[in-house]
Amino acid sequence: PDVYLLHGDLSDDEMNQMYNHPKVKAHLSFTHGEGFGRPLLEASFSGKPILAPIATGQKDFLDYDYTVGLPYNMHQVPQSAFPKGYANENAIWPTVDYGQASALMNDVFKNYKKYQLRGKKQMIVNRENFTHEKMKKKLESIVDKMLSGVSKEVSLKLPKLKKKQDTKLPKLKKA
């Protein structure tokens, strides 16, 4: 099969056209340091098969049953991959097994209808779970949980003062 590599900045409209172009039959990513991976979530909305390592942030929205999970091994992140001042010597990320990924790509090409159904199911799950309203509620839940106990309303209990009737103020001298 033909494989096209894209590199550079694309507008939202261009990305949408690419995701939904009839010649694009599947979405492939060997990502390893993406975090949440918004492009893969967006690609899932096209209903086409997704081939990617289901590791790190992608686990939040790529279902093992509906995605072609690419085999990977976890490796230490090279220090050169971090912005200055952000290095973390304990950080690890997945590196795809290229040989097995190649075999899976060929299988998707040869058995496209089987994988196409999985892509459609992933689309349905993500369109249900990743609406703007559901993300808003999820964020509110996280913020509420983080802020619970940070500040609490407390009642103010002041002592009761007895009023003295015959209190005289001292006379002040003019300066």
Predicted region positions:
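Nucleotide-activated donor-binding/catalytic signature segment of Leloir-type glycosyltransferases, i.e.
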Residues: 1-18, 25
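Aromatic "clamp/platform" in nucleotide-sugar-dependent glycosyltransferases that forms part
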Residues: 32
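Short hydrophobic faces within alpha-helices
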Residues: 42-43, 51
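C-terminal amphipathic helix plus adjacent low-complexity
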Residues: 83-175
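Short hydrophobic beta-strand element within catalytic cores of glycosyltransferases
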Residues: 49-52, 68-71
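Short glycine/serine-rich donor-binding loops of glycosyltransferases
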Residues: 37-40, 55
